Amino acid sequence: MAIYAIRSEFLKKTSEIAVSWFSVLNAFFVITLASSVSKIWSSKYNPSVAFKYGFGLFFVALGYLVVWFGAKGLSEDMKISMAYIILIYFFHTIGELFISPVGLSYVSKLVPHRMLAFMFGTWYLGIAIAQKVAATLGGQVVSITKEYGLSTFFLIFAGIAAGAGILVMLYNPVLKKLMHEVK
């Protein structure tokens, strides 16, 4: 059934790939890249948690920069190449692999055992709040696009992610001190 649907879609003169088809990319990149990232953390190149977070945020910024570049000069009726969409998923997934497992690991290492379930819930509540903020900011795309262009919208997010990455890395000594040598 799926083969028939794909075949009939691509035999048309003009073909359009549904956005929903790209949702599999995150899972694909997690499965294919997780072991490589894990190998980095278990080798001699195991940076501190702040640097892992910072690098993860830099990869998120890089993903937004790719889309910023792809969206430069596009008018409203034009569509971006799927290569840019694949690249943003690639870089954001690497960023996710640098941030999410490390964050969960350090929640379990740093929180007193009696508060562990509560803090994991707080971690996921933070993710839910971030999703709500992202939806609210995403609603601003029309007003920003009208005034500055679509590429500027992505450039703003790249700047925020890169700035947060720099900030986290600058606070590395403070975070190490607060973690009391937990590795």
How should each PLM-predicted stretch be described?
Residues 2-3, 55-77:
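C-terminal ends and interior cores of transmembrane alpha-helices
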Residues 16-17, 82-83, 108, 113-122:
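Loop-to-transmembrane helix entry/capping segments in MFS-fold secondary transporters
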Residues 23-30, 120-135:
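Glycine-rich segments within core transmembrane alpha-helices of 12-TM secondary carriers
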Residues 40-41, 137-147:
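Interfacial helix-cap and linker-helix signal at transmembrane-aqueous boundaries
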Residues 42-60:
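Cytoplasmic membrane-interface "Motif A"-like loop-to-helix N-cap segments
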Residues 55-58, 148-173:
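Symmetry-related core transmembrane helices of the 12-TM Major Facilitator Superfamily/SLC fold
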Residues 65-69, 128-141, 170:
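A gly/Pro-rich, aromatic-decorated transmembrane alpha-helix motif that marks the paired
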Residues 89, 93, 97-112:
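Intracellular juxtamembrane helix-capping segments at the cytosolic ends
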